[in-house]
Amino acid sequence: MPSSKLLKERIESIQDTMKITNAMYLISSSKLRKARKNYQNVSPYFNRMRDTISRVVPHLPEEPVHPFFHERDTANPKRAYIVLTADKGMAGAYNQNIIKFLKENADENDRFYVIGQTGYRALYHKDPRLVEDFHYGATEPTLQRARDITVDAIDDFKSGKLDEIYLIYTRIENALTSEPTMVRLLPLDRAHLQPAPKGLGDPKGEVEMFPSAWTVFEQIAPIYMHGMIFGAMTESFCAEQSARMTAMDSATKNANDMIRELQLEYNRTRQGSITQEITEIIGGASAVQTSDY
């Protein structure tokens, strides 16, 4: 049985760890609220942009096909995945799930554009599909970072370096569940850009576009994709913080359980040592009394 001194040291060590896990829980909770507020502030703009682009698409000519819609006829398309992971660990299975999902869906010749230090390190020098000079952080998503990634993706697609670009991120299903998901960024799918029924605030009748629908589409399509990436980055960041909160809450509860068990063991050990000391004192006193007679 461990000594009372050793048990006390273990209890103090676990208490120190519990302070850290509890602090990380509070930090993640604060970051989650901030990220959600940030997304709520900008999402109306991007939602309106999606509505706008869906009203422009029907006015585009069938021929020639706009490059953003062009499905390249090739047996082996040059495919890339923009993958959103976290910069830090200690978030349960968050990073492992997204990497596993990526490998299950990717082919041998695909390319991985990984956002987040944890995912980058997991594939660096281990998977030749990783594009090593593509290096962006995932902490606290910003519009500028999403814009830079969008520009890189569009340039690679237009130049023919890539034929298809997919976005893999963690989607929040509900307050307790999040799952990896994949959406195609380029080429765009006309079927997913159909106009919604007009609401009270929408213009009536036909909308004229100057100088042309093609030119308008050229201007707003990158903003639409920018919104897709920023939304995915923000949702993934929220999912990461939620996963870390769950992991840290579980760790704190486990630490409490361990402390409770160790405290009982410490009390039993301490009680045993006190009982032994009392027994020795009584035995010594009895021996002294016997020697006096």
Q: Residues of each region from the PLM?
A:
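C-terminal beta-strand-loop-alpha-helix "lid" module of Rossmann-like NAD(P)-dependent dehydrogenases
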Residues: 1-293
